[in-house]
Regions:
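Zinc-dependent deaminase
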Residues: 59-128
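Immediate flanking context of iron-sulfur cluster ligation sites
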Residues: 42-54
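Short beta-strand scaffold segments in enzyme catalytic cores
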Residues: 1-8
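Histidine-rich, glycine-flanked metal-binding segment
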Residues: 7, 35-36
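A short, polar/charged loop-to-alpha-helix boundary motif
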Residues: 17-31, 35
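Residues embedded in well-ordered beta-strands within globular domains across many folds
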Residues: 2, 49-51, 73
Length: 128
């Protein structure tokens, strides 16, 4: 995950560290927002854009709402736990005090293939 400022400056990057850190909240999106918050000295990430490979889960989606992220761009949809339009859409829910502009499916086939091959490699299987 990469979080950028309105000017295009990279403010934070993140990778899934939940297993390594024994932290169920250490998803790539959360790690990128934590880094950006430290860089800005603020928990609000107003007008920033978050780029991720896979559609965020509910936890990450709500963290993005609380951080006031302006835009989300993701590659592959997540038909099991996607919370930004696939299974449900937390970031556009009018009951929240902030909504996020979403652009999903950007290079979606490539993102899906890369994710599949990553997990296949972890299981000792050849790439697709």
């Amino acid at each position: 995950a990469v979080l950028v400022s309105p000017a295009g400056e990279v403010l934070g990057e993140g990778w899934n560290r939940n297993i390594l850190d024994h932290d169920p909240s250490a998803h790539a999106e959360i790690m990128a927002m934590r880094a950006a918050g430290r860089a800005l000295g603020n928990h609000r990430l107003v007008d920033c854009t978050l780029y991720v490979t896979l559609e965020p889960c509910a936890m990450c989606a709500m963290a993005m709402v609380h951080a006031r992220i302006a835009r989300l761009v993701f590659g592959a949809t997540d038909p099991k736990t996607g919370a930004c339009g696939s299974v449900f859409d937390l970031v556009a829910d009018p009951r929240h005090n902030h909504r996020i502009e979403v652009r999903g499916g950007v290079l979606g086939d490539e993102a899906s293939r890369r994710l599949s091959n990553y997990f296949r490699a972890k299981r000792g299987k050849p790439p697709l």
